[in-house]
């Protein structure tokens, strides 16, 4: 199994936030678009872990709408990362 670095994680999370701010997607659609955009094969479980971390650590308002996910209120991933870094500095 390849080792994933923080840059890939931040890229994946950025893509997830961007996609879910635009429209609703299910986890399989997110994974397919992620794999296409990043030209890598990410598993469903990796994407689910990223979504959980966005919710838990970065206070991302991801909500389930039927069988799809969506960010339903304004959200800035960059601001959340800055706050997270400032907390540890």
Predicted regions and their residues:
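Short, basic/aromatic recognition patches that contact phosphate-bearing ligands
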Residues: 1-88
């Amino acid at each position: 199994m390849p080792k994933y670095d923080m840059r890939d994680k931040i890229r994946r999370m950025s893509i997830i936030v961007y996609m879910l701010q635009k429209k609703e997607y299910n986890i399989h659609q997110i994974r397919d678009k992620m794999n296409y955009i990043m030209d890598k094969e990410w598993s469903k479980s990796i994407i689910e872990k990223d979504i959980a971390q966005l919710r838990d650590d970065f206070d991302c308002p991801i909500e389930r709408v039927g069988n799809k996910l969506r960010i339903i209120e304004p959200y800035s991933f960059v601001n959340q990362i800055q706050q997270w870094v400032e907390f540890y500095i």
